[in-house]
């Protein structure tokens, strides 16, 4: 039995679902026998069986949903927004019990209220995780729905805190969190790639340049997290008068580096809001 004394079922196991599943196993929150998975791809189920020793697996829509609800306390919705309505139509008539069950939704752009229309009495907690959970350095936002209690929210918050950092927030802040920590890893990867490309242009081997870039980003992040100093102050400490760093900073400012990053964060939030409206209009 898991540390939490509960069993968990995943409906869908894409990249993010796998990251969470892998993280829960690594943190020993659940054992393989505590985990149930429904995925439409048999190849995906075989992968989970071979790599994580999970045996409670099914791709049969007519049986798998009831199987998960009957056996699990926590049900994780890890599917595309486009198929959510179909899944909810399947699972709404399963044997749900408000005192036993809780739903965790990691579906981008879908508010808890949408799920609650189909399962009005079942606690729903929305979570926005990110892919660095694969290496236990994730960052998550956790927002309880209308039917979720403080205890439900605290439980989910603790589960995701085991995979990195987790913030318990009101749902109105979830899209903003998504724009930073959900989308942000892609921007960081782009920066690492660009730094490595710059090193290659200057004559460094690709592997060396990429490792130096990634290590530098990781080191800078740890400096921000482990000191009480503002990032701007830390930047100033690297910039010697008339030196190479301040010359590079000037080049970044000429390219509107900070403003562009802020625009990317804003664009991510706007797109999340658009997705929510699209799904609402379609349903």
Label the model's feature ranges.
Residues 52, 64-142:
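Rossmann-like NAD(P)(H) cofactor-binding subdomain of soluble oxidoreductases
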Residues 2, 214-283:
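NAD(P)-dependent Rossmann-like dehydrogenase/reductase catalytic/cofactor-binding core
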Residues 35, 45, 68, 205-212, ...:
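Small-residue helix-packing motif on alpha-helices
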Residues 1-70, 200-201:
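NAD(P)+-binding Rossmann beta1-loop-alpha1 motif at the extreme N-terminus of oxidoreductases
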Residues 41-44, 83, 195:
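Conserved short alpha-helix immediately C-terminal to the canonical SAM/SAH-binding motif I
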Residues 114, 118-123, 139-177, 189-226, ...:
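Internal alpha-helical scaffold of NAD(P)-dependent oxidoreductase catalytic cores
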Residues 31-35, 98-100, 207:
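Short acidic capping loops at alpha-helix termini that bridge into adjacent secondary structure
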């Amino acid at each position: 039995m898991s540390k939490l004394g509960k069993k968990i079922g995943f409906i869908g196991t894409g990249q993010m679902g796998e990251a969470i599943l892998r993280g829960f196993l690594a943190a020993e929150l659940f054992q393989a026998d505590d985990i149930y998975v429904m995925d439409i791809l048999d190849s995906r189920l075989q992968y989970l069986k071979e790599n994580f020793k999970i045996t409670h697996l099914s791709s049969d829509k007519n049986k798998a949903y009831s199987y998960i609800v009957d056996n699990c306390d926590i049900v994780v919705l890890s599917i595309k927004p486009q198929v959510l309505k179909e899944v909810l139509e399947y699972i709404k008539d399963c044997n749900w019990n408000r005192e036993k069950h809780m739903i965790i939704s990691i579906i981008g752009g879908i508010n808890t209220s949408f799920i609650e229309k189909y399962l009005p009495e079942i606690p729903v907690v929305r979570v926005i995780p990110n892919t660095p959970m694969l290496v236990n350095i994730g960052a998550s936002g956790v927002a309880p729905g209308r039917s979720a209690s403080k205890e439900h929210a605290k439980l989910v918050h603790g589960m995701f805190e085991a995979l990195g950092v987790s913030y318990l927030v009101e749902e109105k802040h979830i899209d903003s969190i998504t724009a930073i920590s959900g989308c942000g890893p892609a921007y960081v990867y782009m920066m690492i790639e660009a730094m490595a490309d710059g090193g290659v242009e200057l004559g460094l081997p690709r592997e060396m340049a990429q490792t130096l870039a990634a290590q530098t980003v990781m080191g800078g992040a740890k400096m921000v997290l482990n000191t009480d100093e503002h990032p701007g102050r830390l930047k100033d400490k690297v910039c010697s008068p008339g030196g190479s760093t301040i010359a590079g900073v000037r080049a970044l400012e000429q390219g509107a580096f900070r403003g562009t990053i802020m625009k990317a964060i804003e664009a991510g939030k706007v797109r999340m809001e658009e997705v929510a409206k699209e799904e609402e209009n379609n349903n």
